[in-house]
């Protein structure tokens, strides 16, 4: 079966590599895919088990299944320009919350695609590990379990993909963990110790679940791969862009400098502000996200982390 992957960043390339084990894959991107990405340590998707052909949008639209790995902040504009069929079978691999409209990914997507044709990828994984064929377990959330299983069956032998519902829980967990991961990077960068880090992540998980429950997310989603699994991975590894943002902030570098040095999108930065605004609107208690938002706006990193630990 032919699968089109939209997005030529690290995540898009890794997913193209993964789906290429069992399927014919086309990748659609403005980037030159012959140019190695630092995020992937120079690995090219052409080294995968099957050749990945880069094609234009119109050719990509002829595929049977679509995988979308576009930055959340550009996702709405991308949908507007791509003009996918309303009944297209879509797996969205983007994680975050749209700042402009404070919208969840599913809210953006349903404006363009039949909700019964939408799936959302969640769970702990790094592009740099997937492109090496290292094993992981992921979750495909969808109201259409048959479609979720169809996508799951297309994943490679080194990925165990589970089909679940609870779209809102899965996407909030995937977005919120990036916020906590920044705080985790700050904690490690300041060398506050394992006890402080454990407290931060434990309370961060509770905060994620509280926020998600307000919108109907299920507790078991936050305790599983989509929530705790993704959080513990992202908040503890140098492979995480959001974690590296925290490390940079811990060195008292201005956010602009940290992001410039990163050279990649760290969704957690903008997601933090979106979460705080949503929480303020609905009266949801989000102490870690709220304190992190102040840090991102220039508050002293030591003062911010001390306040965060005391409040968390």
UniProtKB/Swiss-Prot annotation:
Tree of life domain: Bacteria
One GO cellular component term noted in the UniProt record for this chain: cytosol
UniProt KW Transmembrane helix keyword: no
Organism: Helicobacter pylori (strain HPAG1)
The name this protein goes by in its record: Glycerol-3-phosphate dehydrogenase [NAD(P)+]
Reactions accelerated catalytically: sn-glycerol 3-phosphate + NAD(+) = dihydroxyacetone phosphate + NADH + H(+); sn-glycerol 3-phosphate + NADP(+) = dihydroxyacetone phosphate + NADPH + H(+)
GO molecular function: glycerol-3-phosphate dehydrogenase [NAD(P)+] activity; NAD binding
Protein family (similarity comment): Belongs to the NAD-dependent glycerol-3-phosphate dehydrogenase family.
Entry keywords, A to Z: Cytoplasm, Lipid biosynthesis, Lipid metabolism, NAD, NADP, Nucleotide-binding, Oxidoreductase, Phospholipid biosynthesis, Phospholipid metabolism
Binding site for NADPH: 11, 30-31, 95, 127, 241, 265, 267
Chain positions recorded as sn-glycerol 3-phosphate binding sites: 95, 123, 125, 177, 230, 240-242
PROSITE patterns the UniProt entry points to: NAD_G3PDH
Residues forming the catalytic site: 177 (proton acceptor)
Keyword Oxidoreductase recorded: yes
Pfam families in alphabetical order: NAD_Gly3P_dh_C, NAD_Gly3P_dh_N
Protein localization: Cytoplasm
Role played: Catalyzes the reduction of the glycolytic intermediate dihydroxyacetone phosphate (DHAP) to sn-glycerol 3-phosphate (G3P), the key precursor for phospholipid synthesis.
Metabolic or biological pathway, per its Swiss-Prot or TrEMBL entry: Membrane lipid metabolism; glycerophospholipid metabolism
EC category name: oxidoreductase
Entry EC no(s): 1.1.1.94
GO BP of this protein: carbohydrate metabolic process; glycerol-3-phosphate biosynthetic process; glycerol-3-phosphate catabolic process; glycerophospholipid metabolic process; phospholipid biosynthetic process
């Amino acid at each position: 079966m032919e699968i089109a992957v939209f997005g030529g960043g690290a995540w898009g390339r890794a997913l193209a590599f993964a789906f290429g084990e069992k399927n014919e894959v086309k990748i659609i991107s403005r980037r030159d895919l012959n140019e190695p990405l630092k995020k992937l340590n120079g690995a090219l998707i052409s080294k995968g088990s099957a050749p990945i052909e880069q094609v234009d949008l119109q050719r990509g639209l002829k595929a049977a299944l679509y995988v979308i790995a576009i930055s959340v902040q550009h996702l709405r504009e991308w949908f507007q320009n791509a003009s996918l069929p309303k009944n297209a079978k879509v797996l969205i691999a983007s994680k975050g919350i749209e700042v402009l409209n404070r919208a969840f990914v599913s809210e953006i997507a349903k404006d363009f695609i039949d909700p019964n044709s939408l799936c959302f990828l969640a769970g702990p994984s790094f592009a740099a590990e997937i492109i090496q064929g290292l094993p992981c377990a992921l979750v495909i959330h969808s109201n259409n379990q048959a479609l979720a299983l169809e996508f799951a069956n297309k994943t490679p032998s080194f990925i165990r993909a589970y089909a679940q519902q609870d779209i809102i829980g899965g996407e909030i967990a995937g977005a919120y963990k990036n916020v906590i991961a920044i705080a985790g990077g700050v904690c490690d960068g300041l060398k506050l110790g394992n006890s402080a880090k454990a407290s931060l992540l434990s309370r961060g998980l509770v905060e994620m679940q509280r926020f998600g429950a307000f919108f109907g997310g299920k507790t078991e989603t936050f305790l599983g791969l989509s929530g705790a699994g993704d959080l513990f991975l992202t908040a503890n590894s140098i492979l995480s862009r959001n974690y590296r943002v925290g490390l940079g902030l811990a060195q008292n570098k201005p956010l602009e400098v940290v992001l410039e040095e990163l050279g990649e999108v760290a969704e957690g930065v903008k997601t933090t502000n979106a979460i705080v605004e949503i929480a303020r609107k609905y009266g949801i208690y989000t102490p870690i996200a709220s304190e992190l938002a102040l840090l991102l706006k220039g508050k002293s990193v030591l003062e911010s982390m001390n306040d965060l630990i005391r409040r968390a």
